[in-house]
């Protein structure tokens, strides 16, 4: 059986749409749904309490993505956990496809499918690199290295076969329950962002594979405007700060932050030479956010 865990925070309408799609699409495996609510409003909870399709876990406060999943996982009965975002919609029986792959490949600890955006275009589904000095520099410069090295498979599996990756995003992550228990779930030091990278890294350290399955199709409705918003950028930086401190230490964090700021200055300069005002605006905003964040955490000297 697969235990599907969905963390909700003021997204009840989206969550119910997600559950509708699960009910419609999943035919090949037994499953249960556990919803962990991060102290949403009473109006939101009213929409969920009487729904018999899932078990509702009402948390007293917003404990973050990872901690809410940890709490729900303690209630799970399945041999596999599938962590799903509430703004996801199954486009096929992705749950069964992921389950069957895991069941046939005991050496794999974590897997995930291909994600599509609101326009049904391929979107980031995994990462081929762990967060690091190199990945941060590449991101600051527009992910040139990843595009060259991995071609069409940097964040989306455009091949016809499973591929080994560094990490699966937390939007659709299936993990063996026994592996989850060995890892003790998500590290509680993460609030939101970074916990999926940390989980996958620790999974690989146990000797298990992390694999992207192209046949499993899931729509992820997270808006493109939000992806570029200051709020999203700052949350990612919080996760990065925690991840680097845990795995590499404070000095590494400081060096990476300084490198990011330098790389963004270079990117702005290059796009100005090319007279690409849209890119100049994008990278200038990103540079401002990095500088403010670095100052806040006393990482930029």
Regions found by a protein language model. Name each.
Residues 1-24:
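N-proximal low-complexity "stem/linker" segments adjacent to membrane-targeting elements
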Residues 19-61, 71:
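Acidic donor-binding segment of Leloir-type glycosyltransferases
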Residues 81:
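Short aromatic/hydrophobic "clamp" motif used to bind/position activated sugar donors
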Residues 91-125:
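Conserved donor NDP-sugar-binding/catalytic core segment of glycosyltransferases
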Residues 123, 200, 212, 217-239, ...:
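Nucleotide-sugar-dependent glycosyltransferase catalytic core
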Residues 130-165:
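Short, flexible, basic/aromatic active-site loop/helix in glycosyltransferases
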Residues 158-160, 166-217:
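A short, conserved alpha-helix in the catalytic core of glycosyltransferases
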Residues 231-239, 251-301:
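Non-catalytic, C-terminal membrane-associated alpha-helical segments of glycosyltransferases
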């Amino acid at each position: 059986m697969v235990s599907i865990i969905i963390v909700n925070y003021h997204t009840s309408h989206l969550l119910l749409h997600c559950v509708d799609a699960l009910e419609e699409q999943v035919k090949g495996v037994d499953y249960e749904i556990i919803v962990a609510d991060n102290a949403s409003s009473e109006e939101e909870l009213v929409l969920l309490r009487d729904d018999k399709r899932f078990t509702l876990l009402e948390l007293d406060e917003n404990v973050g993505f990872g901690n809410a999943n940890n709490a729900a996982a303690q209630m799970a009965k399945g041999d596999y956990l599938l962590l799903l975002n509430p703004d996801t919609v199954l486009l096929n029986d992705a749950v069964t496809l992921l389950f069957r792959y895991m069941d046939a490949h005991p050496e794999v600890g974590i897997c995930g499918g291909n994600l599509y955006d609101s326009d049904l275009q391929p979107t980031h589904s995994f990462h081929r690199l762990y967060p690091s000095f190199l990945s941060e520099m590449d991101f600051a410069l527009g992910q040139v290295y990843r595009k060259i090295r991995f071609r069409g498979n940097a964040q989306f599996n455009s091949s016809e076969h499973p591929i080994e990756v560094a990490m699966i995003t937390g939007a659709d992550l299936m993990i063996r329950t026994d592996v989850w228990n060995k890892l003790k779930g998500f590290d509680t030091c993460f609030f939101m962002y970074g916990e999926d990278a940390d989980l996958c890294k620790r999974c690989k350290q146990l000797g298990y594979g992390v694999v992207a399955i192209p046949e499993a199709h899931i729509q992820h409705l997270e808006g493109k405007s939000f992806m570029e918003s200051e709020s999203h950028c700052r949350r990612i930086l919080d996760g990065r700060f925690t991840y680097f401190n845990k795995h590499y230490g404070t000095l590494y964090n400081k060096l990476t932050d300084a490198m990011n700021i330098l790389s963004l200055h270079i990117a702005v300069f290059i796009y100005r030479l090319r007279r690409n005002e849209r890119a100049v605006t994008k990278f200038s905003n990103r540079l401002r956010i990095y500088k403010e964040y670095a100052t806040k955490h006393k990482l930029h000297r």
